[in-house]
């Protein structure tokens, strides 16, 4: 057996050989008191929210989610991740996320490939990195009006109130609620739609069990019942700083009957749980637990019965999906290894890296402006003694709530190139002996040119302005001269076919729209590329169209205020397959008319021959006159009473006109 699996294998053996518990009649004397973070810390991820709702809107074009976030004081940092899986090979529908906060937030947003529209208050939310999504300014409304504002744009799929979150995971397309309308209700379980981790760790308490000798310690985790009673698996990660070979810890897990446990521990431990449990190294091996008391006093009695002399951690949590326990010692003994050398600054000292990331760069009227808000500086506990450009004579102005540094492109040491104006922001901090420096840039938009090109092959060599239905087309967007400090991204594209064909969406929210639109790898110079396949399923086919794409130049590092958006377009000619002259792809019009006339002539000759044979083989006595009967009037009208449909088109549609 591998040595890495030996400790947990021993723990598994101990758990399976444990005796069933018996209740203690005597009162357990153990005064639970808060334990400092140096002795133990418990963090958790949960789907329980103070107020929330989940509703189903399967036919909605826009999936709407609303988050109300309450933070205690000052600016906070938040990680927000959106997850979505492809459905039938295509990206999910468009998403509107409404973000309402009560104070300043540094937001790290991850929504890769999701067609996201973000509504937020730009004066309170600061992105640590450019978001790369469509944004909308959120009006300053109370909660009820924000919900109404969001509902006007589409049925709300989920809404939740969270108190001081550190990270949020929002899963799209996972709504399992039975409601058709989302209305906030107290103490809700968001299920798989939303999980979040509170910033403040759970309250950890501990005590000494009287009358028990030895050094065995107990870690007790009590998970409280949630709003829903569906089966749940709680992953419990335990990390104890114990010497290898020690076997003096017991883990007691108590929860509702529908909760099972998946244990991931780095140390040999005796396991005592309700429900069923398994170990991470043997996830398929489920072990039946015991019936344990559901009160703190009863669980302390279990710990004493298991000969634990110390309750190192006692934690009560809402229904969680992941719980992490970190304890600095084991068995009641002090840690013998030397204390680790501190390599990161304490939380109450200034972080120069984060401070420099808060400098906002604005470019307008042939001038560069740097802005640094004092509120954010104070929250980081930084004391600034100076903010200048590379030229120290160009100093920032103190405008009450912010520092503002402004200069024309022709002064303060600006470096002007064909595509960019560059300088350096220099910040002097009281706690640092050397100044902090950061490169700042402005784009010279007068010198930039955006081009949209259509190609007939994936090699992008032969440019064209003609597309043919059923033939794949390749598109590339370029900016010249290239700007290495900025990233060129494709936000949206559509093909306008006029009143006959309407508009065909190709790309929305940086995601392919349809299963025959493919986002390709960028060119070696970083130019975005994609391909599409177009079919028409009614006639007549339009002869021209306009391909329009919206692109964005986003800084690889820095503020989203420097983003530049442009729309480029090109006129396209559309060749109908039956007029292309390529006989291998279909018969041209003269050939069709010739075949039709030939078939008519052959049919007429055969009919005449049959009539001649019939008339000459019958006896004269049986011949009867032929009476011509006029066809009903309705037959003539029915042959011409057909509907003429308008032209419709779609990327990769397989329908055809009968």
From Swiss-Prot:
Effect of residue 52 to V: In HHT1; impairs protein folding; abolishes expression at the cell surface
Biased composition (Low complexity): 626-639
Effect of residue 149 to C: In HHT1; impairs protein folding; nearly abolishes expression at the cell surface
GO BP of this protein: artery morphogenesis; atrial cardiac muscle tissue morphogenesis; atrioventricular canal morphogenesis; BMP signaling pathway; branching involved in blood vessel morphogenesis; cardiac atrium morphogenesis; cardiac ventricle morphogenesis; cell adhesion
GO MF terms, alphabetically ordered: activin binding; coreceptor activity; galactose binding; glycosaminoglycan binding; identical protein binding; protein homodimerization activity; signaling receptor activator activity; transforming growth factor beta binding
Segments for region (Disordered): 626-658
Extracellular face residues: 26-586
Effect of residue 150 to P: In HHT1; uncertain significance
Effect caused by changing residue 382 to S: Impairs protein folding. Impairs protein folding
Reported effect, residue 350 to S: Impairs protein folding. Impairs protein folding
Impact noted for substituting residue 269 to A: Impairs protein folding, but does not abolish interaction with GDF2
Intrachain S-S bonds: 30-207, 53-182, 242-330, 350-382, 363-442, 394-412, 493-549
Chain segments carrying region OR1, N-terminal part: 26-46
Domain note: The ZP domain mediates dimerization.
Protein name: Endoglin
Provenance organism: Homo sapiens
Gene name tied to this protein: ENG
């Amino acid at each position: 057996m591998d040595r890495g699996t030996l400790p947990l294998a021993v723990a598994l053996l101990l758990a399976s050989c444990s005796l069933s518990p018996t209740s203690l009649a005597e009162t357990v004397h153990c005064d639970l008191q808060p334990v400092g973070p140096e002795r133990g810390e418990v963090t958790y991820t949960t789907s329980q929210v103070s107020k929330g709702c989940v509703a189903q809107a399967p036919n909605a074009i826009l999936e709407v989610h609303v988050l109300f976030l309450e933070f205690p004081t000052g600016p906070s940092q938040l990680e927000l991740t959106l997850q979505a899986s492809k459905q039938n090979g295509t990206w999910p529908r468009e998403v509107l996320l409404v973000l309402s906060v009560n104070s300043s937030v540094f937001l790290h947003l991850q929504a890769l490939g999701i067609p996201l529209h973000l509504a937020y208050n730009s004066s309170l939310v600061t992105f640590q990195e450019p978001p790369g999504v469509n944004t909308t300014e959120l009006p300053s409304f109370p909660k009820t009006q924000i919900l109404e504002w969001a509902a006007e744009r589409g049925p709300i799929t989920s809404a939740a109130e969270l108190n001081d979150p550190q990270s949020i995971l929002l899963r799209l397309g996972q709504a399992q609620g039975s409601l058709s309308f989302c209305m906030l209700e107290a103490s809700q379980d968001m299920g798989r739609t939303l999980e979040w981790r509170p910033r403040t760790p759970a309250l950890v308490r501990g005590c000494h069990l009287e009358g028990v000798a030895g050094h065995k310690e107990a870690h007790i985790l009590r998970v409280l019942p949630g709003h829903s009673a569906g089966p749940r698996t709680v992953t419990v990660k335990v990390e104890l700083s114990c010497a290898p070979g020690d076997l003096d810890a017991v883990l007691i897990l108590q929860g509702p009957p529908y909760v099972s446990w998946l244990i991931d521990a780095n140390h040999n431990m005796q396991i005592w749980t309700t429900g069923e449990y398994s170990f991470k190294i043997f996830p398929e091996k489920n072990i039946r637990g015991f019936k344990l008391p559901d009160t703190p006093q009863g669980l302390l009695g279990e710990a004493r019965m298991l000969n634990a002399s110390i309750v190192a951690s006692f934690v009560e949590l809402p229904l969680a999906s992941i719980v992490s326990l970190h304890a600095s010692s084991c068995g009641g003994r002090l840690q013998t290894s030397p204390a680790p050398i501190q390599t990161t600054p304490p939380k109450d000292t200034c972080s120069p890296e984060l401070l420099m990331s808060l400098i906002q760069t604005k470019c307008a009227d042939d001038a560069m402006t740097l802005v640094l808000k004092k509120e954010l500086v104070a929250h980081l506990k930084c004391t600034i003694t100076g903010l200048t450009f590379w030229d120290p004579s160009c100093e920032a102005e103190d405008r009450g709530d912010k520092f503002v540094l402004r200069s024309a492109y022709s002064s303060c040491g600006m470096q002007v190139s064909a595509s960019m104006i560059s300088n350096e922001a220099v910040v002097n901090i009281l706690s640092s002996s050397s100044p902090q420096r950061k490169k700042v840039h402005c784009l010279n938009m007068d010198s930039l040119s955006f081009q949209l090109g259509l190609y007939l092959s994936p090699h992008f060599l032969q440019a064209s302005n003609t597309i043919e239905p059923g033939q794949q087309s390749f598109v590339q967007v370029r900016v010249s001269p290239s700007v290495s400090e900025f990233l060129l991204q494709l936000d949206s594209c559509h093909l306008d076919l006029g009143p006959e064909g309407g508009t065909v969406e190709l790309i929305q929210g940086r995601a392919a729209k349809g299963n025959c639109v493919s986002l390709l790898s960028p060119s070696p110079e970083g130019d975005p590329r994609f391909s599409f396949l177009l079919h028409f399923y009614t006639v007549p086919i339009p002869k021209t169209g306009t391909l329009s794409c919206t692109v964005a130049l986003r800084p690889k590092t820095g503020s989203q205020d420097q983003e530049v958006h442009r729309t480029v377009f090109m006129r396209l000619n559309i060749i109908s397959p039956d007029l292309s002259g390529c006989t291998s792809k279909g018969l041209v019009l003269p050939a069709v008319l010739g075949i039709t006339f030939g078939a008519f002539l052959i049919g007429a000759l055969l009919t005449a021959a049959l009539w001649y044979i019939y008339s000459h083989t019958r006896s004269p006595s049986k011949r009867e006159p032929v009476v011509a009967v006029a066809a009903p009037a309705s037959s003539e009208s029915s042959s011409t009473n057909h509907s003429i449909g308008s032209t419709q088109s779609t990327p990769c549609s397989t329908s055809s006109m009968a």
